[in-house]
A protein has these predicted regions:
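ABC-family P-loop ATPase nucleotide-binding domains
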Residues: 94-178, 279-282, 452-517, 521-523
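A short, proline-enriched helix->beta-strand linker immediately N-terminal to the Walker B motif
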Residues: 194-198, 517-526
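ABC ATPase nucleotide-binding domain signature region
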Residues: 49, 62-141, 242, 249-250, ...
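Walker B catalytic motif
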Residues: 175, 204-205, 528-531, 535-539, ...
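Hydrophobic anchor residue at the start of the ABC signature
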Residues: 188-189, 217, 515, 543
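Coupling and communication elements adjacent to P-loop NTPase active sites across diverse families
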Residues: 14, 19-31, 111-185, 266-389, ...
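Flexible loop/N-cap segments at domain edges
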Residues: 340-450, 454
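Pre-Walker A (P-loop) beta-loop-beta motif of ABC nucleotide-binding domains
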Residues: 40-51, 83-85, 225-226, 397-408, ...
Length: 578
């Protein structure tokens, strides 16, 4: 095919169209024995902001890897505009521990590296060569026109705005190996922002962002002229896009024009139509099964060879159609809670019959006593520095938490929110945190369930089922094989998942394990640290509903504005000392 190169079973083509930037059709993509995609279509036009959503495990990260060129083991066609400048967030950083952050970011900026190399090297060898002198002059002019003379300073500003640098930290000395996984994700976002490419591909960009950083990102989204394709479940981000592509469990895609609110309305109508189609096919299956039986009986009763052949042909035709219909997977029906409330009784009952399985969260719902569970009185915490000195992390914090109350800790990344939770609830690392001022009073008999940002190390190297069993044993709770199977079912894990190492599971699957850990036992106080980061939209809704039903106390950290608005918490702001 002219202008195309074959990559395994994938075809990459280039097109001269001006508005079309990317047009992909994937007819087969598998992960192990599981077929993830069979009819996937993704397109992005010039300047368009498009989001990809879907259930955990549907294959969104795999699709991102395919579209960004990190995975070429698929069947299908990907067409890009000729000369397209594309930048994508990297999912892994193997072998880059010593890489300096600023050069790493600038390496992702089209033209910068080439022009910088020309400006640095041409003076050393051009002499009186007019061609090289002209090349050098053009490089200088282009470098200036692109604003590259002050780009390092601009990147440093972004590093500070996104909370990766503070105080007297030198940007020129910052290395990737010094950063957490969440901070590396922010580096990728900064790389995309400064790349000024035609098309930016971003995978869950706002995970681990604080509210100030997220607002900066959303502002950039609105103002930027470049096209974007974003894998996300962040409803604040989904509100800013112009189209949403849903990757379904059956390996197909549906495209919705508009932002999140418009997507929800269209999804309600699409789901109703899909349920009609599903019911029609179920009726057709029932009819075909009866026809097969009828043709068999008529064939047996007949004595005419021609009539027997006719019934045999009709039976084979019915069996072929039946086999085709029975191979079709049941669609994953989901309608958001507000739209469900708008359904008439008949449609609501039908949706209740056919809706997709969602996680089932059992929370403590016995009316509490409203007693005071936790008191923070002018608390100031600190960590010992290399010099031995202990500097305060934040200004004094005071708060009270009663049973039945919901409290949100707010503040920038690095302000000390997670550190405060660690100290208050004696989590891993609490011994390294010093109480410099004030007092912390937690009722000793209160049963606390914690949702960690990271899974505790002792469970990561165990198969999922064993990790659940170990978790219950470590907490002195009764556990049985039946209970393990029940939990796996309630949290949407498959039989294949149960023997997978926890460390090898997806972000969404790990998040569901964290929910199991938080709710193990009859908890009176739930502590959640960024719980919506890796959950899909239906799971986030179920978590919100479960927390709204919970009659104990809730203390959480989240930069998900929709999540916080639904829970309507009281708030405590953590102000960093430095």
């Amino acid at each position: 095919m002219p202008g195309c190169s074959i990559i395994i079973t994938a075809t990459l083509c280039y097109n001269e169209a001006q508005n079309m930037l990317l047009d992909a059709t994937i007819t087969e993509k598998s992960f192990g024995d599981k077929q993830l995609m069979r009819s996937v279509s993704v397109s992005v036009d010039k300047g368009e902001k498009v989001a990809i959503v879907g259930r955990n495990g549907a294959g969104k990260s795999t699709l991102f890897a395919v579209l960004s060129g990190q995975d070429d083991d698929f069947t299908g066609d990907i067409t890009m505009r000729r000369g397209l400048q594309l930048v994508a967030t990297a999912q892994e950083h193997h072998g880059l521990q010593d890489a300096l952050v600023i050069p790493y970011i600038l390496a992702g900026v089209p033209e910068y590296t080439v022009l910088k190399q020309a400006i640095d090297e041409l003076p050393l060898r051009m002499g009186d060569n007019l061609r090289l002198i002209d090349e050098y002059t053009q490089a200088l002019e282009r470098f200036s026109a692109k604003g590259f003379y002050d780009i390092e300073a601009q990147v440093e500003v972004s590093l500070r705005q996104f909370g990766l640098l503070s105080g007297e930290q030198q940007a020129s000395e910052l290395r990737l190996g010094e950063l957490s996984g969440g901070q590396k994700r922010l580096v990728e976002v900064i790389k995309v922002i400064h790349a000024d490419a035609d098309l930016a591909l971003l995978d869950e960009p706002t995970n681990h962002m604080d509210m100030e950083a997220k607002n900066r990102f959303l502002s950039w989204m609105k103002q930027s002229r470049e096209a974007m394709l974003i894998v996300t479940h962040d409803r604040d981000v989904l509100h800013q896009v112009g189209r949403i592509i849903e990757l379904r469990d059956n390996g197909t895609t549906v495209s919705y024009t508009g932002n999140y609110e418009q997507y929800l309305r269209q999804n309600m109508h699409t789901t109703n139509a899909d349920m009609n189609d599903f019911e029609h096919k179920q009726r057709r299956i029932k009819t075909l099964k009866q026809k097969v039986l009828d043709y068999q009986r008529l064939k047996e009763k007949s004595r005419n060879p021609g009539t027997i052949q006719n019934f045999k042909r009709l039976e084979l035709t019915a069996r072929a159609e039946l086999a085709e219909l029975e191979e079709l997977q049941k669609p994953s029906f989901w309608i958001d809670r507000d739209s469900v409330d708008q359904l008439d009784t008949e449609r609501a009952q039908r949706y209740d019959r056919y809706k997709a399985r969602n996680i089932r969260l059992a929370t403590h719902t016995v009316e509490g006593s409203r007693r005071q569970l936790l008191t923070l009185d002018n608390v100031v915490l600190g960590r010992p520095a290399a010099s031995g000195e202990v500097d305060p992390l934040f200004f004094p914090v005071s708060a009270e938490l009663h049973e039945g109350q919901c409290l949100q800790l707010r503040g920038r990344n690095g302000a000390g929110k997670s550190t405060l939770l660690t100290k208050v609830f004696s989590l891993d690392g609490a011994a390294d945190i010093e109480l410099l001022e004030g007092s912390i009073t937690l009722r000793p008999e209160v049963r606390v369930g914690v949702y960690y940002q990271e899974i505790q190390e002792q469970y990561l190297r165990q198969p999922l089922a064993q990790a659940i069993e170990r978790l219950y044993i470590d907490r002195g709770l009764p556990i049985s094989e039946t209970k393990v199977r029940s939990l796996l079912h309630d949290y949407l894990f498959t039989q294949a998942d149960r023997d997978q190492l926890l460390a090898q599971l997806s972000g969404g699957q790990k998040a569901r394990f964290q929910l199991i850990a938080m709710l193990a036992g009859d908890q009176q106080l739930l502590v959640l640290d960024e719980p919506t980061n890796h959950l899909d939209l239906p799971s986030i809704e179920e978590l919100e509903l479960a927390l709204a039903r919970f009659t104990g106390a809730i203390l959480f950290v989240s930069h998900d504005a929709y999540f916080a608005k639904y829970l309507q918490p009281q708030t405590v702001d953590i102000e960093p000392f430095a």
